């Protein structure tokens, strides 16, 4: 069996893919670092309890005023739970938004984008297609 040698175009494409992956990793690390610096607040419905964390779930502070203690321990725990839930939802929305921004701003070399176009004309179905046809395809990649 003889080995198939890669063409110059294949080597260039592989180089573009490697460079693109490295860029993506660097952008993801920068985004995570920015999220670590972003402080978010969750509040109870009556605004008597406030919990502050970073977007990477590092605890910063919890604040409450005397009104938060009205109704006893059960009510106080309920307000804390409410503020925590509000904070978690805020963190999730923020990280999702930042992730979408990151993905939309990523530079994808034209050769890689064209992979899906070239593959669409070929054979479909199973048989090791893997993720071919998904790169640069907003429907296949969930966007």
UniProtKB/Swiss-Prot annotation:
Transmembrane segments: none annotated. Gene3D superfamilies: Nucleoid-associated protein YbaB-like domain (3.30.1310.10). InterPro entries: YbaB-like_sf, YbaB/EbfC. GO terms for molecular function: DNA binding. Residues 118-143 are annotated as: Disordered. Residues 124-133 have a biased composition (Gly residues). Pfam families: YbaB_DNA_bd (PF02575). This is Uncharacterized protein CBU_0658. It comes from Coxiella burnetii (strain RSA 493 / Nine Mile phase I).
